[in-house]
């Protein structure tokens, strides 16, 4: 390892499937060491994971970082949002954590919306209408199905909170991750006692919300990690807010993440409240807001279409007239949970490459429609769209986003943006800088800019028309008679 120019910090991304750790030079942003270890997630009706796995994975990831991790002066945890972690009086998990993608609590979500003033109430109070991913619905599900677990619970945490608490011995969270629970009021930036009372959750069980820039604590003696006692621990945040930090995005800069699911978001200084539920009104990790919309069908759905056609994912061909809505897992944006994929306009001369391009078009159309709802009216339409995630380096994805958005597209070279965002937050504790400014100094968003091209209005109009005409069929789903 070459000598670092400044102090070292550790940024962690504890995601659904694995924990990744980066040791970063504060002066330059250079990653001097990294490590990664997997988690397991249950399959079947629910999606659960033992939080103790996350700790073991963190220990292993840091072990892989070697001596560099021992030299770190500060650490921060970024993590998967929404998960419900229930702990007993000794800090041990009462049961496995209910993860963000465990949708068994959908009925409880619908009931909570009805019981507490409707969607408008929730949007105005918490910034979001609670979907099955939100923690409040998971607590309601647990109270209904496993009341003995609720009775045994002495602390309620989010995934990143659990790891932070094991480092410091103190129960803390941050505004970014708290805003995805459904029991944090975005208007007052405090826990909502009415909502907590309605779901029977004692606020004393919840962690203290640490303000941006505040130290969450220091590393305590009794731990298994390579940090020295007294190493600073930042408050951490949820994965989307951490990625926004990792990019150093300024208000109004649009971000599109292409993964198994697709995500669009932008930082804004206006508190969002969308009663349709399309846009989640999250807080960011700095003091601003992070309106975000998500689609369920993105890279995995398009790859499935390519596999069915026997084509490489880049083997697209231009073609006009065929439309494919790749809603293979139902869809959240637009809100069509019972939908399936829909193909329209197939003719004798339609090629496999044209069908594959139509799948890309359908996936990107949904994301761009959501982006229009996320951006402020005064956002700069000429600002490049930051394209991140696993699909961002694919030529077919890049060209489809350019053609349908009419925007310039920038593809950051930096990877592991959640861990980099956590590292920037940790660095801010040492230097006093805004973490987003740290990331900009590190030039994490630097990458090739693809110039804007004329927007393909014909394809956009065709997609909008097919979606509108087919909405009753898509809403009914394949199981209805």
UniProtKB/Swiss-Prot annotation:
Residues holding substrate: 81-82
Cited PROSITE patterns: FGGY_KINASES_1, FGGY_KINASES_2
Enzyme Commission code(s) on record: 2.7.1.17
Catalytic residues identified in the record: 239 (proton acceptor)
BP terms from Gene Ontology: D-xylose metabolic process; xylulose catabolic process
Pfam families named in the record: FGGY_C, FGGY_N
Disulfide partners: none
Residues carrying the site annotation Important for activity: 13
Signal sequence range: none
A single MF term (Gene Ontology): D-xylulokinase activity
Domain of life: Bacteria
Reaction it catalyzes: D-xylulose + ATP = D-xylulose 5-phosphate + ADP + H(+)
PANTHER family in the cross-refs: SUGAR KINASE, XYLULOSE KINASE
Family: Belongs to the FGGY kinase family.
HAMAP family in the record: XylB
Identification of the protein by name: Xylulose kinase
Species for this entry: Streptomyces rubiginosus
Gene coding for it: xylB
């Amino acid at each position: 390892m070459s000598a670092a120019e400044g102090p070292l910090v550790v940024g962690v991304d504890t995601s659904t499937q694995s924990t990744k750790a980066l040791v970063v030079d504060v002066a330059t942003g250079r990653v001097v060491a990294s490590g990664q270890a997997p988690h397991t997630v249950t399959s079947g009706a629910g999606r659960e994971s033992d939080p103790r796995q996350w700790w073991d994975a963190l220990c292993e990831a840091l072990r892989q970082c070697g001596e560099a991790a021992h030299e770190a002066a500060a650490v921060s945890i970024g993590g998967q949002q929404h998960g419900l972690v229930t702990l007993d009086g000794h800090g041990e998990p009462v049961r496995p954590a209910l993860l963000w993608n465990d949708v068994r609590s959908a009925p409880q979500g619908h009931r909570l919306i009805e019981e507490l003033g409707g969607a408008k109430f929730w949007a105005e109070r918490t910034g979001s209408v609670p979907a099955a991913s939100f923690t409040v619905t998971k607590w309601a599900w647990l109270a209904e199905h496993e009341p003995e677990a609720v009775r045994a619970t002495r602390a309620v945490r989010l995934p990143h909170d659990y790891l932070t608490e094991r480092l410091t011995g103190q129960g803390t969270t941050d505004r970014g991750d708290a805003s995805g629970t459904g029991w944090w009021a975005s208007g007052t930036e405090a826990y909502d006692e009415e909502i907590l009372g309605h779901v029977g959750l004692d606020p004393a069980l919840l962690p203290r919300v640490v303000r941006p820039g505040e130290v969450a604590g220091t590393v305590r003696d009794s731990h298994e990690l390579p940090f020295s006692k007294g190493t600073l621990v930042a408050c951490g945040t949820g994965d989307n807010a951490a990625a926004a930090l990792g990019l150093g995005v300024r208000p109004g800069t649009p971000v599109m993440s292409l993964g198994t699911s697709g995500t669009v978001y932008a930082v804004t200084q206006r508190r969002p409240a969308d009663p349709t539920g399309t846009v989640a009104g999250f807080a960011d990790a700095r003091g601003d807001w992070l309106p975000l919309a998500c689609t369920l069908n993105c890279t995995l759905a398009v790859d499935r279409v390519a596999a069915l056609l026997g084509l490489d994912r880049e083997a697209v061909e231009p073609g006009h007239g065929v439309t494919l809505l790749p809603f293979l897992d139902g869809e959240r944006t637009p809100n069509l949970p019972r939908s399936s994929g829909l193909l329209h306009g197939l003719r004798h001369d339609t090629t496999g490459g044209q069908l594959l391009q139509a799948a890309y078009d359908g996936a990107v159309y949904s994301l761009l429609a959501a982006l229009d709802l996320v951006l402020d009216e005064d956002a700069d339409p000429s600002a490049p769209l930051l394209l991140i995630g696993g699909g961002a380096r694919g030529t077919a994805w890049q060209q489809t986003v350019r053609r349908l958005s009419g925007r310039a597209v920038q593809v950051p070279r930096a990877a592991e943006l959640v861990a980099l965002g956590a590292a920037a937050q940790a660095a801010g504790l040492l230097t006093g800088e805004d973490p987003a400014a740290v990331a900009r100094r590190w030039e994490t968003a630097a990458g090739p800019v693809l110039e804007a091209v004329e927007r393909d209005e014909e394809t956009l109009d065709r997609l909008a028309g097919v979606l509108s005409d087919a909405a009753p069929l898509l809403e009914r789903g394949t199981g209805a008679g």
